[in-house]
Amino acid sequence: MGERGVEDKSAVQESATELEAGIGYRFVNRQFLAEALTHRSWVNERRGEEGIRDNERLEFLGDAVLGLLVGKMLFARFPQSREGVLARMKASLVGEETLAALASARGLGRHLLLGRGEERSGGRERRSLLANTYEALLAAVYLDGGLGPVERIVEQDFSPLLAGIASGATGRDFKTEFQEMVQTRFGTAPTYELIATDGPPHDRRFTVIAMVAGKRMGEGAGRSKKEAEQAAARQVLARFAAEGEG
């Protein structure tokens, strides 16, 4: 490998530790990570060199792994939703725009190996390229460590998004509905208090209680505070409905 290749390989190794810390997973075989970050434009500039592969095969596998895990999350969190609704939610969650945003949030663009032309044309910020790299990274983690580590990453990234689409999935925004009910009945607004934060930094789980005039009304948990608040509001509404007070 030429001098530029050695420098590029070294750069990948140096950035690997930073990237691993960000996703909460340390690779046993960093070759999987290096391949996930290698765009075909970089490979095309080094035709004839041995052992260089782009990330397109990993992208293919990552798409399947991501689809499985997001489907599993939707199936568990929206037990009353029918297949068509779940399919639409899944399509919106794993679309290019969402994946590119997640890749940008994790800073994947700056870790990429790109050819000169791709670099000059702004490839590090190109949405399609970032989305593909996100899928390739998930596949790399899967091949290196199995489904468990990938599921933790996907839960971390997608749980806040699931909370955001909860109203679209059910036709209800539980926090807003709860607030309107409380204002009508009690002339005040509910409040939420965070009572527990569990798990490592890359896999937090929040527990909150919903209160009205200082009285505890319900409790909910989620991967984000917003999701936990929605869960708490939903619990209160469900209880009121069961008691015939909805």
Swiss-Prot record:
Coiled-coil regions listed: none
GO CC terms, sorted: cytoplasm
Any one Gene Ontology BP term: mRNA processing
Disulfide linkage: none
Top EC class of this enzyme: hydrolase
Residues annotated as catalytic: D63, E135
Main location: cytoplasm
Co-factor requirement: Mg(2+)
GO molecular function term, any single one: rRNA binding
Domain DRBM intervals: 173-242
Catalytic activity entry: Endonucleolytic cleavage to 5'-phosphomonoester
EC number: 3.1.26.3
Annotated Mg(2+) binding sites: E59, N132, E135
Cellular compartments annotated: Cytoplasm
Record Gene3D superfamilies: 3.30.160.20, Ribonuclease III domain
Keywords per UniProt: Cytoplasm, Endonuclease, Hydrolase, Magnesium, Metal-binding, mRNA processing, Nuclease, RNA-binding, rRNA processing, rRNA-binding, tRNA processing
Domain RNase III, residue spans: 16-146
Quaternary structure and partners: Homodimer.
Function: Digests double-stranded RNA. Involved in the processing of primary rRNA transcript to yield the immediate precursors to the large and small rRNAs (23S and 16S). Processes some mRNAs, and tRNAs when they are encoded in the rRNA operon. Processes pre-crRNA and tracrRNA of type II CRISPR loci if present in the organism.
PANTHER family, A to Z: RIBONUCLEASE 3 (PTHR11207:SF0), RIBONUCLEASE III (PTHR11207)
Entries under NCBIfam families matching the protein: RNaseIII (TIGR02191)
Family: Belongs to the ribonuclease III family.
Protein name: Ribonuclease 3
